[in-house]
Every structure is written in structure tokens, then in C-alpha cells.
């Protein structure tokens, strides 16, 4: 039923609650952060009936502005626009608006050069790791030769390491998430993988076993 006095942020709160029930905690925290930081302040005094295409385009342009004190990356901007589009779709599905408004999320692609170790740098790192044996060094070695993400490495337990069959069972990840309270502090969260493919068996090189 259409509510003529509903504000955009009222629907934003409803949308966030739906995401809280349907998404992984890490995904919800990310959405909540983007909503609180970028979406809610802009639409604070805007009624849904006033959220027309020119207003939405102005919002999009504000995200793209190079004059911003802290310019956003294209990935962040694209995610914000997708969230706004999802909220606009909910507005239509619940009968608050008569049509679906849409903000194009496609942006010019930036291809930053990804720094990688040179062969000499990798040899220097391995020489150091071999000379300084410890938990931290072993974890770096694992990351270097298994390709595990930092969160996956930190979440490894002894029962995930199968020495006789020489493989690792990646079952969890650790993430540092912002707490959803007034302190805005962060906490470490152990969770399962986001996708089936992330729950996987990774070969363990034989030369790493003595480490």
C-alpha cells in the first residue's frame, strides 16, 4: 500500500532489515556501512515521491566527483549504486512508486598495476623464512605456495591440515568487521565460506611439511 509520506531512508531501513536476514554477516555489515556513510546522509530529508531521476543522477555524480576529500574507488561506487537500485526496486515491488528508477552502475574501468614479487625478491623472502622458523614464518610460507587468502590462513586449525595425504581443508575464514554499535570498534569473526567453491581442498607441497 502506497505511503505518500514515506521517506527514502524509511525504505532504506526496511531494505537493510531484509538483507540482515538473507545475507552473510560480513555482507550485511558492508551494506550497512555503505548505507550509513553514503546513502542515508544524502537522502535524509527526501520523500520517496521526490526521489526522481534528476535527484538520483545528482547523487551518482556526487559519488564520482574528483573534488571529494576522499575519492571513492570504482568498485565502491558501483556497489553503492547497486544498493540504491535494489532499494528502488523494493519501492516499486511494495507499491510505493509506480515505476522502477535505475542508476547505471557501469563505470570507466581502471586497471591498476598489481605489484608482484620479482624472482629475486621471492628468493630473499624464502631465505629469510628458512632462517627464521616460527608460526608467522610458516603461515607466510603457506600463503606463498598455496594461494590461500589472509583470512583463510588465519582460520586454519590443526584438524584442517592433513599431513599424511598432503592437503589443507579450507573450511573457514576470519574477517575483521566493524561492530554495529556506537563504539564503531571492530572485532574478529570466524565464519564459513561465502560460496561452495571456497570450501575446498588445497594441495600441500611436500617441502613445506618439515616447516
Task: Describe the role of every protein-language-model region.
Residues 21, 46-49, 70, 115, ...:
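Helix-turn-helix-type domain boundary/helix-start signal
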Residues 10, 14, 33-37, 58, ...:
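Generic recognition of well-ordered alpha-helical segments
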Residues 4, 8, 24-27, 31, ...:
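Hydrophobic (often cysteine-bearing) scaffold residues that line and stabilize catalytic clefts
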Residues 1-50, 54-57:
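N-terminal DNA-binding module of tyrosine recombinases/phage integrases
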Residues 74, 78, 93-150, 154-156, ...:
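Basic, Lys/Arg- and aromatic-enriched nucleic-acid-binding interface segment
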Amino acid at each position: 500500500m502506497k505511503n505518500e509520506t514515506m521517506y527514502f531512508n524509511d525504505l532504506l531501513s526496511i531494505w537493510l532489515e531484509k538483507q540482515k536476514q538473507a545475507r552473510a554477516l560480513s555482507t550485511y555489515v558492508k551494506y550497512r556501512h555503505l548505507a550509513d556513510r553514503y546513502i542515508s546522509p544524502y537522502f535524509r530529508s527526501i520523500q520517496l515521491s521526490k526521489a526522481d531521476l534528476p535527484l538520483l543522477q545528482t547523487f551518482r555524480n556526487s559519488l564520482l566527483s574528483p573534488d571529494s576529500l576522499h575519492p571513492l574507488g570504482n568498485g565502491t561506487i558501483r556497489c553503492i549504486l547497486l544498493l540504491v537500485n535494489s532499494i528502488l526496486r523494493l519501492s516499486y515491488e511494495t507499491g510505493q512508486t509506480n515505476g522502477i528508477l535505475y542508476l547505471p552502475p557501469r563505470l570507466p574501468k581502471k586497471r591498476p598495476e598489481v605489484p608482484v614479487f620479482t624472482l629475486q625478491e621471492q628468493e630473499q623472502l624464502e631465505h629469510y623464512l628458512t632462517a627464521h622458523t616460527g608460526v608467522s614464518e610458516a603461515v607466510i610460507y603457506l600463503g606463498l605456495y598455496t594461494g590461500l587468502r589472509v583470512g583463510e590462513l588465519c582460520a586454519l586449525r590443526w584438524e584442517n591440515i592433513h599431513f599424511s595425504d598432503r592437503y589443507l581443508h579450507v573450511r573457514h575464514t576470519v574477517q575483521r568487521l566493524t561492530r554495529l554499535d556506537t563504539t564503531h570498534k571492530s572485532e574478529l569473526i570466524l565464519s564459513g565460506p561465502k560460496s561452495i567453491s571456497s570450501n575446498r581442498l588445497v594441495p600441500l607441497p611436500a617441502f613445506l611439511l618439515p616447516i
